[in-house]
Regions:
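Ligand-binding clefts of soluble mixed alpha/beta catalytic domains
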Residues: 1-165
């Protein structure tokens, strides 16, 4: 199982969630181990996804992974953000082994999105006072990536079992 970053940036949507759940259940039915290669920036936003049942389909993915009795190995290749990462074979969902590339990013939210939320007041003040907002945003993004969005932190807190060098 893998995300395809060349198609919709690898996000999970209604159709891909259905496909993931079906594939994991198929592997479990035939006693085949599930190897998940993760590069997922999140779920596809939008009211069309909500009306199509993204919550229900996402729950199918959770159910498929959580109930699978076969060995499950997950490798984070690049991005692993939010609930989409959790359902894609994370430790929280019951994977047996989780690994990551050293350059991978594992967090609730990507650095740029998090900075825009966390530092919105500072960025607004900087804009009002005529400061270089882009430089300040870049500084905050760098700090957030160093402190939060890195695989080393995930290794330290036990979200992954090891790094692939």
């Amino acid at each position: 199982m893998a995300n395809q970053p060349n198609v919709l940036a690898g996000i999970l949507d209604v159709d891909s969630s259905e496909k993931v759940a079906r594939f994991v259940r198929l592997c479990d039915a035939f006693n085949l181990p599930v190897v998940t290669l993760v590069d997922v920036p999140g779920y596809k936003p939008g009211s069309d996804q909500e009306h199509a049942g993204i919550i229900r389909r996402g729950a199918k993915v959770i159910y498929a992974y959580a109930n699978a009795q076969v060995p499950m190995v997950t490798v984070v290749l690049r991005k692993a953000f939010g609930g989409a990462y959790i359902v894609m074979g994370s430790k929280a969902i019951g994977a047996d082994l989780n690994f990551a590339w050293p350059s991978s990013q594992i967090a609730v939210l990507g650095a740029a999105g998090a900075v825009n939320i966390i530092h919105r007041h500072d960025l607004a003040k900087a804009k009002a006072s005529g400061q270089d907002v882009d430089a300040l945003r870049a500084k905050y993004i760098k700090e957030y990536e160093t402190s939060t969005v890195n695989a080393n932190l995930s290794l330290e807190i036990g979200q992954i079992d090891g790094m692939i060098d």
